[in-house]
Amino acid sequence: SSPDEANQAVAEYKTTLNIQEGDTVDESITIPPQPQTSVVVMDQYTGEVKAIVGGRGEKTASFSLNRATDSHRQPGSCFKPLGVYAPAIDTGKYTLASLIEDSPYTYSDGTPVNNWDGKYIGQATVRYAILHSMNVCAVRTLTDIGIDTGMKYLENFGFTTLVSKEDDPAHNDYNQSTALGGITNGVYNIELTAAYAALANNGVYTKPILYTKVLDHDGNVILDNSTPETHQVVKDSTAALLTNAMQDVIKRGTGTAAQLANGMPASGKTGTSEYSTDLWLAAYTPYYTCSVWGGYDSNKPMENIYNQTWHEVMWKNIMDRVNTTLGLQVKNFTMPASVEQKTVCSVTGLLAVSSCPSYTEYFAKGTGPTQSCSGHYEEEEDDEDDDDKNKEDSDSQNSQDSEDNEDSGNSDQSGDNNNNSGNNGNNNGNNNGNSNGDSGTVTPPEE
């Protein structure tokens, strides 16, 4: 809300207080700038929080409020890589080349699941679904792998605000809308940053720390916090595959406004809650992980704000300064030995043969397709002469459907929040690269 709107609300409230002439009234009005923001910058290898911003504007009241650690907000599509695709790939049920049906779909209670752009393309690979933040694909995939599995991974990623069945058997986060970040309480910025830092650190989660040691006046160590808690939350191959897929988000997806000036690679995911109430970018370089949140303290929608990428620009400006100030050299993300490449058919997801439209994809070793595509041929018959009925076969390679021309500047609408839908058990994902039908064509990743 604007200061004028806030002052008007105060004036209206004061009319209800029945203040009489001669009464002494003491008032203090503080109006923080809106919308607000929070930022966390973390060293993904040590867990050290290098920078934290709890809000913007000069603090004149509520000195203890830190929005990065105290305010839980809806994460939107930032949850898709963590609660959907990380477990899907880590358990071996899906690969980046697996095909997912992208067509009209409903939650188990009958509520439609809508893609943020209102479009469907028939089939999409996991990589393409991440790139274009496709809601239907995310919900179908979580439903297929099991909501319990998704929740287990989210808990291992360090989120403490999730509502379990034990906490509330009737209203909890064990529902399909969790795939889109539609959860009961939202998440803290510092916890979302730590979760993405785990992907940046070969799948190793490190609990964030705000200090390393506390010394007394004689230099004796009173508190030693230099060795934070760690655990492996996903395989190094899973982390590498998601990192590679989410680089596409920054290169040509919903996070292009965050591209760094010096060519430093970045990988991450945007998130937008319903009506643009919350805007997120959680992303990392080979050095640091940073998450930026933006929104009104009052949960006022921001859907009418023209610039929906200001939080991405903020992320870029912060990380550009980090890279410049510290003199960080450009280096690329690396692939572990547990990952291999295979050439697959972009229509079926099977191993490509000479007649296939194909592309090269990364796989965790042992999870890629082993069956070869049968090829793509059409028979054409020449005109038959009564005396000589010779036939000539001509191969006609199927051309790939062109991909939807998505506007990469649009934010990704994550669907309704707090929609407690049960698991309907639909198995619409196609595992290990096998075909899921002929209802569409998948666009391969661009190199």
Task: Cite the ranges covered by each PLM segment.
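A penicillin-recognizing enzyme superfamily signal
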Residues: 1-31, 35-43, 51-53, 58-71, ...
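Secondary-structure capping and boundary motifs in well-ordered enzyme cores
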Residues: 41, 46, 71-77, 118-122, ...
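Active-site SXXK
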Residues: 47, 74-100, 129, 194-199, ...
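Sec-exported extracytoplasmic/periplasmic mature domains
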Residues: 84-93, 101, 105, 131-135, ...
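Conserved catalytic neighborhood of penicillin-recognizing serine enzymes
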Residues: 93-150, 175, 217-243, 247-248
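Short coil/turn segments at secondary-structure boundaries
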Residues: 142-145, 152-157, 165-174, 207-212, ...
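Ser/Thr/Gly/Pro-rich low-complexity, disordered linker/stalk segments of secreted
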Residues: 372-447
